[in-house]
Regions:
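Blade/loop signatures of beta-propeller domains
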Residues: 21-37, 136
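Beta-strand-rich domains and repeat architectures in extracellular enzymes and scaffolds
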Residues: 27-29, 37-70
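Predominantly a core beta-strand signature of beta-propeller blades
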Residues: 38-39, 82-85, 128, 146-150, ...
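A flexible loop/linker signature enriched in serine peptidases of the S9 family
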Residues: 44-47, 64-74, 89-94, 109-138, ...
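Residue-level detector of Asp-centered blade-edge/turn motifs that repeat once per structural unit
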Residues: 55-56, 101-102, 165-166, 209-210, ...
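Hydrophobic beta-strand positions that form the internal "hydrophobic ladder"
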Residues: 60-61, 106, 170, 214, ...
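Short loop/turn segments that connect beta-strands within beta-propeller blades
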Residues: 78-82, 142-146, 186-190, 250-254, ...
Length: 349
């Protein structure tokens, strides 16, 4: 997910009202959050989001504006919040970081080759939009940030990259064919294959634990007016993300199936370790669309259950490799209103 969308979603969320009291024995957990225990806050201050586990479950990689930075850079830390290190270049804007399963390298997207400065913010005169920066390319590096290598070199937007658990493929989002679609490629950037081709935004892919399926978010305009609006925004490297649904497909792009159908902003889907359920973020229960919470749903669209009840923002969930812990980003317990921080919790079925 792009940093601009993170900021916009959080800005909407902090306007929500009606805080519930936390559970007395677990001060960061609300009483209704029965699947979460022992919630711990790992970051403090600024915008911190999209934290993902290393293959051994001992580290997290995430994006942050800490240290007074104007736009996100990539950091790693231990799962107790210690040993925070910046591993990107410190230039441009970065997003969508992920560990290789063997822990030997990381991947992330960056605009630093296009410009060392932060790219301009999107034009909000066009409404609720976020930027698809064409300067984004995908890179890999050692976990300490050294040995930086460029993976994609195609003109346009290449970002939202994730490594398959078997370590063989990268799924990512690109505008290389004049639309926002999901592709796969080998770890070295070769053998690129387009998986989606319906007009509209297909992005934010994540793999199932067996590397056989991909879950993603999508918005496919239906009417000619909607299509024209989408294409006009895309021409200006913008997208309007107010309606996103969760989809799944096989790793080769076949078997596409829509999972949610609520007309809201559903994003950041991630498979449960059992491969039968998906956890994701949505504003479906807030008529004003400001409050984002975590939900689980079966891959066939049944069994919807709300997981978090924080009245501002909870998003970007990911399970640890053993399925025992959940990491997510939240505004709960923010010292400065609107600050987004990283939290980790024990998962309880």
């Amino acid at each position: 997910m792009k940093p601009a969308l993170v900021v916009l979603i959080v800005a909407m969320a902090v306007l929500a009202e009606g805080y519930a009291s936390p559970a007395s024995d677990d001060p960061l957990r609300l009483p209704q959050e029965k699947h979460l225990r022992n919630i711990r806050q790992l970051s403090n201050g600024g915008e911190n989001a999209e934290a993902y586990f290393s293959g051994d479950g001992k580290q997290l990689i995430f994006q942050s504006t800490r240290d007074g930075r104007a736009c996100d850079q990539i950091y790693t830390m231990n799962i107790d919040g210690s040993d925070v290190r910046m591993v990107s270049t410190g230039k441009g804007r970065t997003t969508c970081s992920y560990f290789y399963p063997n822990g030997k390298r990381i991947t992330f997207s960056s605009t630093h080759l296009a410009s060392a400065a932060c790219p301009p913010k999107p034009d909000f005169s066009k409404g609720y939009v976020w930027a698809i920066y064409p300067g984004f390319d995908i890179f890999s590096a050692k976990p300490d940030g050294s040995d930086l290598k460029q993976t994609t070199k195609t003109p346009g937007y290449d970002a939202e990259s994730v490594i398959s658990p078997n370590g063989r493929k990268i799924a990512f989002t690109s505008t290389r064919d004049a639309d926002l679609d999901i592709y796969t490629m080998d770890i070295d950037g070769k053998n690129v294959k387009r998986l989606t081709n319906e007009i509209g935004y297909d992005g934010g892919p994540f793999w199932s634990y067996d590397s056989q399926w991909i879950v993603f978010r999508a918005n496919h305009p239906k009417t000619e007016k909607e299509k024209a609006d989408y294409l006009a925004l895309l021409k200006d490297n913008l997208i309007r993300p107010t309606t996103l649904e969760i989809w799944v497909m096989k790793a080769d792009g076949t078997g596409k199936r829509q999972v949610t159908n609520n007309g809201k902003a559903n994003f950041a889907p991630y498979f449960f370790p059992d491969g039968k359920r998906i956890i994701f973020a949505s504003n479906m229960d807030d008529p004003k669309g400001r409050d984002f919470d975590l939900y689980l749903i079966n891959v066939d669209g049944t069994g919807l259950e709300r997981i978090t009840f924080n009245p501002t923002f909870d998003g970007f969930p990911m399970f640890s490799p053993d399925g025992k812990k959940l990491v997510f980003a939240s505004n709960r317990h923010d010292k400065v209103q609107g600050d987004t921080n990283i939290f980790i919790a024990d998962w309880v079925e």
